[in-house]
Amino acid sequence: MNNSEQLIALKESETAFLKYFNKADYELVDFSLVEKLDWKQLNHEDLQQMGERNFWQHEHQIYALRNDFTDQLLRYYSMYPTAATKVAYTGLIIRNNEAAVQVGLENYAPSLANVQQSLKLFIQFIQQQLRDNVHFVVLGHYQLLDALLDKSLQTPDILSMIEERNLSGLVTYLSTEHPIVQILKENTQQQLNVLEHYIPNDHPALVELKIWERWLHTQGYKDIHLDITAQPPRSYYTGLFIQCHFAENESRVLTGGYYKGSIEGFGLGLTL
């Protein structure tokens, strides 16, 4: 496929996404690539993200190029509430001076049923329009770390070793028998079963992970992995997250996660 054909295919995929979810009764939204920001309203995490963002000042006003749709929509709807419970978007995001096209969905005040329905529809779009399918799924939950590791041990060094799956370092700091070390020693396909030995069966994170595992099995997905190493990109990501890796285009990953800040929601996004 030459450059012109790739460009046409990309634009057609964006349009097809909007048509598909418009037909499914999602509200289509179109936000400017340029965000107007107020320094006084930016929190510590907003300021930390400025390192990857392109921003400038004009007449005492700060402007920045969008780097995350969920964050932009959350910021906007916090100021201007919407009655919409499910929205669909497409457009550019700019991170570290690199541009990419993203398509995605946001479910506000989400229920398990409507989030799973959104994921099901998204995968159907991938199958029908992108001619691809989900090869394997990664599940995780941002409450797991607190369940497995005492707050006093959640130092930058230890968190970094967990993220890097540095078992030798973790053994030194935590011990061989520590739950995190024991879980990480297992194949990721087995870790969800092993997790049951280290946290109560009624722990909300484990209950939710098991519900999703069962639902994914009913959808025909058996290759399911647990990730206990991921740490939330923003503090409002407090619950379950999911990554659906593609069979044909291995660079593509459909990602999603639950968040609760000024607005509660569950987002699903895919970079084309």
Curated annotation (Swiss-Prot):
Gene Ontology cellular component terms for the protein in this record: cytoplasm
GO molecular function annotations of the record: catalytic activity, acting on a protein; transferase activity
One family name in Pfam for this protein: tRNA-synt_His
Biochemical pathway: Amino-acid biosynthesis; L-histidine biosynthesis; L-histidine from 5-phospho-alpha-D-ribose 1-diphosphate: step 1/9
Keywords: Amino-acid biosynthesis, Cytoplasm, Histidine biosynthesis
InterPro entries named among the record's database cross-references: aa-tRNA-synth_II/BPL/LPL, HisRS-like_core, HisZ
Signal peptide limits: none
Compartmental location: Cytoplasm
Domain of life where this protein originates: Bacteria
Any one GO biological process: L-histidine biosynthetic process
Further comment: This function is generally fulfilled by the C-terminal part of HisG, which is missing in some bacteria such as this one.
Protein role: Required for the first step of histidine biosynthesis. May allow the feedback regulation of ATP phosphoribosyltransferase activity by histidine.
Similarity comment text for this entry: Belongs to the class-II aminoacyl-tRNA synthetase family. HisZ subfamily.
Cited NCBIfam families: PRK12294.1
Subunit organization: Heteromultimer composed of HisG and HisZ subunits.
Designated name of the protein: ATP phosphoribosyltransferase regulatory subunit
Organism: Staphylococcus aureus (strain MRSA252)
